[in-house]
Amino acid sequence: MTSKLEQLKQFTTVVADTGDLDAITRLKPVDATTNPSLLLKAAAIPGYADLLKQVKADAKGDVDLACDKFAVAVGSGILKVIPGRISTEVDARLSFDEPALLNKARQLIALYEAAGVPKDRVLIKLASTWEGIRAAEKLEKEGIQTNLTLLFSFAQAQACADAGVFLISPFVGRIYDWYKKSTGKDYVGAEDPGVQSVTRIYNYYKANGYNTVVMGASFRNIGQIEQLAGCDRLTISPELLQQLSDDQGELPQVLKPGNAGEAKQPLNESQFRWAMNEDAMGTEKLAEGIRQFARDQEKLEKLMAEKA
């Protein structure tokens, strides 16, 4: 019997949610994703010490540029050991500023291209705010493909699909966390609200012929991953990838394109904002996620300033 990880790879593109090059080399994902929190962890890995020094020297005291160069350097290194793409995130503090998001995305792509990485191997990650979705729509038309993250609500998924973004990252574990805390209940299998959210989005996209890739993210256990086997892509931490690799049990495909989904429902800005307002979980987790990524970005900047 092959491992659950190898079985999963038969019908889902497996992505590593980490900046740890050793883990990526060992687990052989197709793609990899990073974010400010993961870059902060990567900065503490001894193997990145020389890279940190080099990045700071190149940035010549510009802390913002040093952070961008570090993200691109980590991403470029990862691309040497994976066949697919790297997702690199825009500063979360820009999440409500469309022009600033556009500028930062273009800067990151320019840094990648200067490092010899073509833009078709990079996905720019943006928070799934209204402004982030609008920025992504423009970037896609420029040939810069995007990954819309911190996606917790169906309204966010609807708006992303209508904007023609390349990929979305609907979160599973953080939705599970919210409902567990809110209700005091534990959720397993198909009853998990995070699993239900991604399943609903996947079925809606397939039923309506959207090309946007659905990449489930933020997992708490392999049970959640198993329930989403068949999703276009799943981005998984090294710890859970290792658990899947060590498990020889059977892993059947659950999500399939032929499953029934809801009819297409385009949203304008006021409808989007109202739908978000009505979704307490989606509103709270989006705001919390942006705050957390912003804090970690600030910590990364502090690290860059200290070592300069």
UniProtKB/Swiss-Prot annotation:
EC number: 2.2.1.2
Keywords, sorted A to Z: Cytoplasm, Pentose shunt, Schiff base, Transferase
Location(s) in or outside the cell: Cytoplasm
Reaction it catalyzes: D-sedoheptulose 7-phosphate + D-glyceraldehyde 3-phosphate = D-erythrose 4-phosphate + beta-D-fructose 6-phosphate
Gene Ontology MF term list: transaldolase activity
Pathway: Carbohydrate degradation; pentose phosphate pathway; D-glyceraldehyde 3-phosphate and beta-D-fructose 6-phosphate from D-ribose 5-phosphate and D-xylulose 5-phosphate (non-oxidative stage): step 2/3
Major site of localization recorded for this protein: cytoplasm
Superkingdom assignment: Bacteria
GO CC terms of this entry: cytosol
SUPFAM superfamilies cross-referenced by the UniProt entry: Aldolase (SSF51569)
Function in brief: Transaldolase is important for the balance of metabolites in the pentose-phosphate pathway.
Protein name per UniProt: Transaldolase
Organism: Pseudomonas putida (strain GB-1)
Lineage: Bacteria, Pseudomonadati, Pseudomonadota, Gammaproteobacteria, Pseudomonadales
